[in-house]
Amino acid sequence: MGRDAIGVGVLGYGWISRAHVHALHSLNHIAPLPKRIRLVSIGGRRAEPLEAAARELGFERWTTSWEELVDDPDVHVVANCLALEGHAAPSIAALGRGKPVLCEKPLGGDAAEARAMWEAAEESGVTNACGFNYRYVPAVTLAKQVVGEGRLGDLRH
């Protein structure tokens, strides 16, 4: 792959993955970027729907092995849109290979997994970001305010 493109690998082929891919497609058209976005590989568990998603979404290839996607030299960044149990291991592996990761929320199943992801990013010097796409939605902002003011009483979680 030439230096004119950023190769993206996406883990998962559900609705949130499709939202990420739509945003990635848009990046090539909304502004003059120094590099274009190239959809290299999409990964998941089941071959038949994965192959259909790859074709529909415009990926060059697909794989049922997250290891293969993370190890692919044409994949420069990884968007991890798998279910929660698929967040930590692939993200840590990608970060360990120096590939930035955008992982859907929550980062891990517990604080230890999230910390391991953070440590992998720190050690490799690349970004591990979490998709907090609802953070500034008015309803969420209002809920935070109501909880913060104690208007709902003493909450437990």
Can you say where each PLM-predicted feature lies in the sequence?
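N-terminal Rossmann-like dinucleotide-binding module
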Residues: M1-L57
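Hydrophobic Val/Ile/Leu positions in short beta-strands of Rossmann-like dinucleotide-binding domains
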Residues: V8-V10, N80, C103
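Conserved SAM-binding strand-loop segment of SAM-dependent methyltransferases
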Residues: E60-W66
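Beta-strand-loop-alpha-helix segment that lines the small-molecule cofactor/substrate pocket
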Residues: V77, L84, A88-R135, G150
